[in-house]
Structures are given as C-alpha cells and as structure tokens.
Design a protein with these regions (language model features):
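Short alpha-helical segments enriched in small residues
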Residues: 1-142
Length: 142
C-alpha cells in the first residue's frame, strides 16, 4: 500500500499510529509524516538505534537483549508491546535489523529485519531476509 493510500485510510478511520525504529533510523517516521495532515494520525516516532535506547526508552529488559540480541523476534515483540503502552496508538510498529554493510553474522546476516505490528491485543512479528543488499535498499524496503 502506498503512503498516499495509507494516509487517506488512517484519516478516514480516525486511526493513530506510532513507530519505534532501529535500523531504519527514522525513515519510516519520515515517510509517514511527509503528507500534510499526518498529525491527525501520527502520534510518535522513536529512534531506538542503540541497545541503551531500547533499554532506557522502550524499557526492554537488558537480559532479553543479552540473551537473544537486539535483532531478534523477542526484542522486536517487546519493542512494539512497550511502544503501545507509551503511545496509546491504535496501531504500533517496531523495526529492528541489520542494514549493513557490516555487522552481520552467519546466524544474523546483513539484511535480516524484524517488523513488529500491534493492533489491539494482537502482535504480529514479520521476519524479513533482504540478503546482502545495499544499506539504502534494506532501509527503504523495510
């Protein structure tokens, strides 16, 4: 769905949205707010790039990060869950991943991105493997 269509749909349905981003560094927030009138639905965008930001702002237990890593479905789930407590938005999104070109491992390669979506009491975690593409490709396609 294009940003234009999403923009119209969110306004029509009086739906609010918030995001917590890591590897996209605010890119999704920027796209969601590019159109006039986005203040009707966009409540907040948090860039929690570092582990410290995830721990201090989103209240992710550091034991989760040390056990599973910041790039994990577990961390992504807590990011979106805790964001929803802060934002009170109807829809909450979280993004954590490895945009590269460095930082990947065999278990967690460059291009691995988790996206969390929370609406109501339902949470969906989507695992994406973009492959070893350019950083901008991974960020723009997340």
């Amino acid at each position: 769905m294009s940003i234009d269509k999403l923009h119209k749909k969110l306004i029509k349905n009086k739906c609010t949205i918030s995001v917590a981003e890591s590897c996209t560094g605010g890119l999704l927030s920027s796209k969601l707010t590019k159109l006039s009138g986005s203040s009707k639905y966009f409540k907040m965008g948090l860039i929690t790039y570092s582990n410290t930001a995830k721990i201090n702002i989103l209240q992710i237990n550091k034991k989760i990060i040390y056990k599973y890593g910041a790039v994990s479905s577990e961390c992504c789930r807590l990011m979106v869950k805790n964001l929803s407590k802060i934002s009170k938005s109807k829809i909450n999104l979280s993004i954590t991943g490895i945009a590269g070109p460095n930082g990947g491992t065999k278990e967690k390669p460059v291009g691995l991105v988790y996206i969390g979506v929370k609406k109501g009491n339902k949470i969906l975690i989507i695992k994406n493997l973009f492959g070893k593409k350019k950083r901008t490709f991974i960020q723009n396609n997340t």
